[in-house]
């Protein structure tokens, strides 16, 4: 398991952009359209809204629709 889990969908342009920017980085990817429990977690941290991409870090923090550079910086900080 990596230090980063990305909650996304395959139809979301923001998700595709983030994943493209993270090319070469290690992360776990969960499709919230396929995993109802994951979708509920996303809603729980986004005021009841299923906003993707949402990123969960191994230190317990999370970010909604972050820039790839922000995720990479956090990956490096957690390494």
Curated annotation (Swiss-Prot):
Keywords: Arsenical resistance, Cytoplasm, Oxidoreductase. This is Mycoredoxin 1. Gene3D superfamilies: Glutaredoxin. GO terms for cellular component: cytoplasm. Its EC number is 1.20.4.3. It is found in: Cytoplasm. Residues 1-79 form the Glutaredoxin domain. The gene is mrx1.
């Amino acid at each position: 398991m990596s230090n980063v889990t990305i909650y996304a969908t395959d139809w979301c342009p923001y998700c595709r952009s983030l994943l493209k920017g993270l090319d070469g980085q290690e992360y776990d990817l969960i499709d919230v359209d396929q995993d109802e429990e994951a979708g509920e977690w996303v809603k729980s941290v986004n005021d009841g809204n299923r906003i993707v991409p949402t990123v969960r870090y191994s230190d317990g923090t999370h970010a909604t629709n972050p820039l790839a550079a922000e995720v990479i910086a956090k990956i490096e900080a957690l390494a």
